[in-house]
Amino acid sequence: QAGAGRIVAAGRRLSVLEALGVDATVDLSLQGEALTQAFAAAAGPGGYQVIVDYIWGPATEALLATLNNHDLSSYAGGRGIRLVNVGSMAAPDIRLPAAVLRSNQLQILGSGTGNFPPIPEMQRYATEILALAATGALTIETQEHALAEIAEVWDLNKKSDVRSVIRIAR
């Protein structure tokens, strides 16, 4: 859990999120005010401290709306809030009301190729991940498909916890 005291996971497949053993979940199939309320409820009494955002777009806007509440709960105990953007699967842009920036100690950061750690550290991480995979501690359920089936199976990963592997004939 990377030293986190409370972890909230957001996604469309709640069964997968709940299996992670997190403290709270947010259903990203919700929209508008319902999604904002879900993020507010999931924050708990300490609010959010670090947010790792893989999708950007409407879900991020809903989360940010919970920070625009003009009370001390959004200060994460005086430590501030860090929003780390890792991807933009839902949308490339968001609307960011200026009031969100003025009403709390929010830092917005990006994590991409320009933010990679030094090569020796990356090698250590890769070694640790491969060791976990070799012992079976890191598993991913997969389903194999022929390249000819790609049009039919393209969206399967959106509806299932099983990852598709496309077989390419040699």
Predicted regions: what they are:
Residues 1-30:
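Mid-domain Rossmann-like dinucleotide-binding core that forms the NAD(H)/NADP(H) cofactor-binding site
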Residues 10, 86, 111:
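The conserved SAM/SAH-binding core of class I Rossmann-like methyltransferase domains
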Residues 24-106:
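Glycine-rich cofactor phosphate-binding loops and adjacent beta1-alpha1 units
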